């Protein structure tokens, strides 16, 4: 008996030991599996973020380029000054005129066939709820109601301070939501899960309502409607995408014009004014600061509270180059003597030609001719006559135009015929934000937190700063606050704490990069101000996918975008690969491949980890780079029936070209008029120190107008660019037939191809 019992215990112990080892082995395998998935997820995330931030850098550089052209362009007529004012300056007079025009929304008829939601003011809760339901059913709000709602929204916003103060004493809880970026499903899901706004349920939406998603208009209408219904319980902060210059690139401008073709221009101009009246921050119980981006080491809440926020129409520029008339005159004379000796910003090459990126104009060159041959309609003036007019003119209308074009500063000598009160009134209206005020706003809208101490420029985004835990702690102590809530960054889980839990990032657009890429989140605060975070994914497809399927789907999308990026820089990559191929055998090591790719793309990605997904493995760890580039081209050409070199150029420049098109199309008509083209080309030719006749510019415009309807649309604009690239495959104007002809004829035309 004893022996049998002992044997049974021995076998039981062996079985238990074997089971324990098996469990440990399975656990080790599973942990490795999860670790590999996590590594893939992080690499995928890095790809999406790097490409997104690279696009933001391009936008900033492109706008800096146009701003530089404006600063060094000498207007030769009233038309040129007005054109600059329309495109580049913050035209308060035009906006006020447009608002008066929009107040006449009653003149817009709503047809009997219209089946969408109807609004009457003052709005009631049922109106706002009906809007949510109508947009859920894919109905569209009529332009009359859109303009009416925007007009009422502006009337409400102008009464609000720069920093809203709200309290948890008057509601059970306050819900803070982050970026929505035009994703209506997320907003509807938040209201479904958390409840519609009410006196007991307050909301703060922390900016970036628009761009990228397809339902930005609908989101704005819902948010504005609830803000009018519950002005004390529903609050909005401005984000960096509530900016008409940013909207030109990221889709909102295009969305409005597609949905409201007749009244789209009025809606966009009104929205531009509404955006600049949005509050900059919200303070809960004087303890929790909510702003879109972050803070910096110079953030001053007292100064932010006093800024005339409506003057900062766009954070992409600061029109505070306050120079005296004498300084402006000296600048004009210097430019007239030799524009080639003028200062060249960091984003332009040493030669005075336009850079190959973001814009290549190929061979649009012409023989230098006199400005006196301008067409009569331009009313051209030489530089000396313009200077004389700037010095001597005392007419109010001319002064206003010069103010808007940035040629004078407020506070100069007033005309004798005007009273001091009138002058002060006009000065207040035309006052531009100072550099300090502008930077305060840029920092709170564009900045990101970092783990290191200190504060440094945000070179990744191209605007704002990176702020460390010490900067956060300093601000919280200065104003006796507990923590800071910000948005601005997509997070895998929809939220993230940092800086010892003193900074909370909330991002409410789920599936932002791709279905399954990230969760959305919002945070609820009660009287104790303890953050309660709720996560979600609005897309039902994600609930049916396993973790591996979800990561694989997102990874595939990210790698596809990365291959497009690599293909767009094929020529640059080939040149860089050749530097590592000293023996000219067409082979480089995989380590050299990774170094070369990073030196060209500057994305900061873990290329060695991504290599297996991008490069076929080889036994000797060598890569035949020409065949690899050829395979990249085949992958893209399978989707596009365009020559490889031309497709590469379009992939690299399309976003910038579309943005340039919308900048030139200052009236948002969807077309560039011949006059807009002429004036813009004079801007370029002035920068490149090329005198070109207006007749030649008009011939060029007509040649781009392929269908001869008197306007240039986006397809014609891109096609002209493609043809120029086709005739100049290496971007060398000297090898282009057009450049040769230009020397003889004084103008060039893509239509000749």
Swiss-Prot record:
GO cellular component, one term: photoreceptor inner segment
Compartments it resides in: Cytoplasm; Cell projection, Cilium, Photoreceptor outer segment; Photoreceptor inner segment
Positions of the UniProt region annotated as Disordered: 318-382, 409-435, 732-753
Entry-linked PROSITE patterns: EF_HAND_1, EF_HAND_2, SER_THR_PHOSPHATASE
Positions of Mn(2+) 2 binding: 208, 240, 292, 488
Amino-acid positions noted as binding Mn(2+) 1 in the UniProt annotation, renumbered to this chain: 179, 181, 208
GO process annotations (BP): cellular response to hydrogen peroxide; detection of stimulus involved in sensory perception; negative regulation of apoptotic signaling pathway; negative regulation of MAPK cascade; protein dephosphorylation; visual perception
Protein residues bound to Ca(2+) 1: 665, 667, 669, 676
Manner of cofactor binding, per the entry note: Binds 2 manganese ions per subunit.
Enzyme class, spelled out: hydrolase
UniProt note on regulation of activity: Activated by calcium.
Reaction catalyzed: O-phospho-L-seryl-[protein] + H2O = L-seryl-[protein] + phosphate; O-phospho-L-threonyl-[protein] + H2O = L-threonyl-[protein] + phosphate
GO molecular function: calcium ion binding; Hsp70 protein binding; Hsp90 protein binding; iron ion binding; manganese ion binding; mitogen-activated protein kinase kinase kinase binding; protein serine/threonine kinase inhibitor activity; protein serine/threonine phosphatase activity
Database matches in SMART domains: EFh, PP2Ac
Signal peptide: none
Spans annotated as Catalytic: 128-540
Family membership: Belongs to the PPP phosphatase family.
General function of this protein: May play a role in phototransduction. May dephosphorylate photoactivated rhodopsin. May function as a calcium sensing regulator of ionic currents, energy production or synaptic transmission.
The protein's name: Serine/threonine-protein phosphatase with EF-hands 2
Organism: Homo sapiens (Human)
Gene label: PPEF2
């Amino acid at each position: 008996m004893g022996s049998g019992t002992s044997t049974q215990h021995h076998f039981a112990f062996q079985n238990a030991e074997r089971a324990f080892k098996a469990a440990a082995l399975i656990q080790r395998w599973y942990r490795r599996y999860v670790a590999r998935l996590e590594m893939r997820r992080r690499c995928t995330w890095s790809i999406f973020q790097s490409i997104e931030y690279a696009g933001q850098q391009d936008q900033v550089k492109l706008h800096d380029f146009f701003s530089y052209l404006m600063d060094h362009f000498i207007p030769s007529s009233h038309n040129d000054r007005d054109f600059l004012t329309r495109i580049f300056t913050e035209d308060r007079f035009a906006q006020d005129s447009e608002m008066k025009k929009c107040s006449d929304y009653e003149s817009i008829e709503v047809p009997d066939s219209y089946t969408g939601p109807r609004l009457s003011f003052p709005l009631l809760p049922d109106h706002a709820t009906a809007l949510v339901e109508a947009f859920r059913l894919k109905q569209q709000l009529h332009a009359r109601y859109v303009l009416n709602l925007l007009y009422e929204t502006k009337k409400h916003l102008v009464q609000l301070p720069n920093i809203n103060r709200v309290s948890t004493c008057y509601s059970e809880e306050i819900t803070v939501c982050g970026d929505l970026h035009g994703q209506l499903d997320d907003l509807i899901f938040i209201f479904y899960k958390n409840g519609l706004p009410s006196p007991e349920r307050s909301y703060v939406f922390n900016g970036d309502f628009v761009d990228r998603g397809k339902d930005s208009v609908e989101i704005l209408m819902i948010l504005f409607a609830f803000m009018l219904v519950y002005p004390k319980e529903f609050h909005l902060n401005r984000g960096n995408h509530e900016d008409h210059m940013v909207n030109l690139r990221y889709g909102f401008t295009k969305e409005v014009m597609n949905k409201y073709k007749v009244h789209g221009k009025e809606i966009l101009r009104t929205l531009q004014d509404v955006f600049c009246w949005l509050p900059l921050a919200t303070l809960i119980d004087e303890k929790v600061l909510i702003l879109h981006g972050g803070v910096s080491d110079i953030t001053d809440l007292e100064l932010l509270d006093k800024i005339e926020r409506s003057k900062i129409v766009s954070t992409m520029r600061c029109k505070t180059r306050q120079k005296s008339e004498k300084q402006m005159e000296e600048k004009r004379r210097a430019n007239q003597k030799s524009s080639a000796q003028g200062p060249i910003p960091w984003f332009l090459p040493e030669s005075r030609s336009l850079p190959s990126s973001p814009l290549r104009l190929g061979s649009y060159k012409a023989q230098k001719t006199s400005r006196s041959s301008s067409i009569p309609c331009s009313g051209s003036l030489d530089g000396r006559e313009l200077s004389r007019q700037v010095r001597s003119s005392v007419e109010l209308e001319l002064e206003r135009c010069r103010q808007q074009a940035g040629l004078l500063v407020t506070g100069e000598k007033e005309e004798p015929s005007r009273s001091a009160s009138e002058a002060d009134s006009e000065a207040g209206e035309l006052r531009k934000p100072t550099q300090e005020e502008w930077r305060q706003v840029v920092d709170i809208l564009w900045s990101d937190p970092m783990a290191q101490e200190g504060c440094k420029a945000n070179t990744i985004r191209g605007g704002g700063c990176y702020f460390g835990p010490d900067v956060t702690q300093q601000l919280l102590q200065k104003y006796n606050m507990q923590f800071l809530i910000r948005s601005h960054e997509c997070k895998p889980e929809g939220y993230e704490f940092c800086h010892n839990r003193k900074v909370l990032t909330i991002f409410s657009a789920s599936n932002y990069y791709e279905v399954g890429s990230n969760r959305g989140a919002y945070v609820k605060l009660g009287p104790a101000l303890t953050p309660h975070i709720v996560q979600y994914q609005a897309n039902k497809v994600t609930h049916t996918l396993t973790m591996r399927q979800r990561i694989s789907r997102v990874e595939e999308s990210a790698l596809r975008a990365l291959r497009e990026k690599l293909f767009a820089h094929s020529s640059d990559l080939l040149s860089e690969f050749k530097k590592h191929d000293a023996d000219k055998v067409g082979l480089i090591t995989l380590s050299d491949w990774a170094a070369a790719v990073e030196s060209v793309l500057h994305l900061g990605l873990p290329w060695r980890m991504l290599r297996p997904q991008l490069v076929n493995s080889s036994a000797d760890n060598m890569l035949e780079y020409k065949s690899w580039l050829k395979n990249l081209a085949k992958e893209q050409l399978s989707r596009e029936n365009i020559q490889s070199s031309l497709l590469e150029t379009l992939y690299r420049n399309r976003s910038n070209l579309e943005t340039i098109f919308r900048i030139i199309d200052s009236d948002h008509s969807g077309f560039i008029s011949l006059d807009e083209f002429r004036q813009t080309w004079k801007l370029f030719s002035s920068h490149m120190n090329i005198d070109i006749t207006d007749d030649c510019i008009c011939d060029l415009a007509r040649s781009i107008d392929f269908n001869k309807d008197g306007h240039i649309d986006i397809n014609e604009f891109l096609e002209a660019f493609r043809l120029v690239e086709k005739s100049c495959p290496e971007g060398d104007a000297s090898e282009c037939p057009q450049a040769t002809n230009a020397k003889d004829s004084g103008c060039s035309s893509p239509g000749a191809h």
